Design a protein with these regions (language model features):
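N-terminal acidic, glycine/proline-rich low-complexity segments
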Residues: 1-111
């Protein structure tokens, strides 16, 4: 699993903090709940919020810079220090990302 496995939520959290906030909140809650019919003890990654969180605040998704890996024909990875650099996110800070989203949803709904 990647780092987005740490950016999870549950149906009770979505129902309490997302669903009450207008039509968009209802829609997002519906989509979240439709993903699995058994909600007891269930949580789900909200992977698409990770990319947005990084764009909004790089501190919410710290990175390391490494040379771009090379995918070989045998589906293994090789490295070459001369390749262009890429950033790898090594941690997702779930709480500030979700708090920011919920606050923005509340503000939008209260306009």
């Amino acid at each position: 699993k990647g780092v987005t496995s740490h950016l999870i939520s549950t149906v009770p959290e979505i129902e309490k903090y997302i669903e009450p906030h207008g039509e968009i909140g209802k829609f997002l809650a519906m989509r979240f709940k439709e993903y699995n019919s058994i909600h007891k003890g269930w949580s789900k990654e909200i992977w698409d919020m990770a990319a947005v969180g990084y764009v909004l605040n790089e501190d919410w998704a710290p990175t390391n810079t490494i040379p771009s890996p090379i995918l070989l024909d045998d589906m293994k990875w090789a490295s070459d220090k001369n390749r262009h650099p890429i950033k790898i996110v090594y941690e997702i800070k779930r709480d500030p990302i979700l708090k920011d989203f919920i606050q923005k949803l509340e503000n939008f709904n209260n306009k």
